[in-house]
Amino acid sequence: MVRGVRMLCPAWLLALAVLCAGGSEVRAQCWEDARCRDLTTDENILNCIQLCRSDLTDETPVYPGESHLQPPSELEQAEVLEPLSPAALAPAEQMDPESSPRHELKRSYSMEHFRWGKPVGRKRRPIKVYTNGVEEESAESLPAEMRRELATNEVNHPQEDSALIQQKKKDGSYKMKHFRWSSPPAGKRYGGFMKSWDERSQKPLLTLFKNVINKEHQKKDQ
């Protein structure tokens, strides 16, 4: 019997090591006991294993039992009731005034990392200030008939301006002188070789005829 127990000593030691490795707290409690410090005898080994097993079962909760019927602890109750506290349900106006500027600072800071910055509101037109103290009459103070006349004049003016521009274009030919590819003057067209008969100067031809007539007269005189 003793020989069989001695053969099982390595197995008991292995089981003891597994139980101790299950948790740091359990392992500390096991090794602090005097029975686990002296493992020279088989009786001490068995007692140490039973001690570690009992500590391990005490640490782990047993769900099949009636533990769910027990009232919760004060810490659990505080964690559950914290979101329902009056401080959490109070509106923002009743909160601490010191917390509101912090909230605004956080909000403004959160908008700074955007490229477009804070959202821009509707742009307002600048208010005209008259130094002479006389303000012009607004359109609202005018009667309905005068407002209609102003509206019709504003509508008709652009049409009249466009008609005048079209008439000017029809009267005068539009020349693209400011463009590089516009038509060059007649004197420089094709280098001056394609001039008409009227455009060319007739002086060389007249001098040629005069010379021929003078030579004929000289021959007749001789």
From Swiss-Prot:
Top-level taxon of the source organism = Eukaryota
Against Pfam families, the record matches this protein to: ACTH_domain, NPP, Op_neuropeptide
Q: Which residues form the signal peptide?
A: 1-28
Which segments are removed on maturation as propeptide? 29-105
**Claim: Signal is one of the keywords in the record:** yes
Alphabetical list of InterPro entries matching this protein: Mcrtin_ACTH_cent, Melanocortin_N, Opioid_neuropept, PMOC, POMC-derived_peptides
Tagged with keyword Secreted: yes
Molecular functions per Gene Ontology: neuropeptide hormone activity
GO BP, sorted A to Z: neuropeptide signaling pathway
Q: What does the entry report about post-translational modification of this chain?
A: Specific enzymatic cleavages at paired basic residues yield the different active peptides.
Q: Where in the cell is it found?
A: Secreted
Name the UniProt key words of this record, in alphabetical order: Cleavage on pair of basic residues, Endorphin, Hormone, Secreted, Signal
A Gene Ontology cellular-component term: extracellular region
Family matches, as PANTHER family:
PRO-OPIOMELANOCORTIN
Q: Which family does it belong to?
A: Belongs to the POMC family.
Designated name of the protein: Pro-opiomelanocortin-2
This chain's source organism reads Cyprinus carpio (Common carp)
Source taxonomy: Eukaryota, Metazoa, Chordata, Craniata, Vertebrata
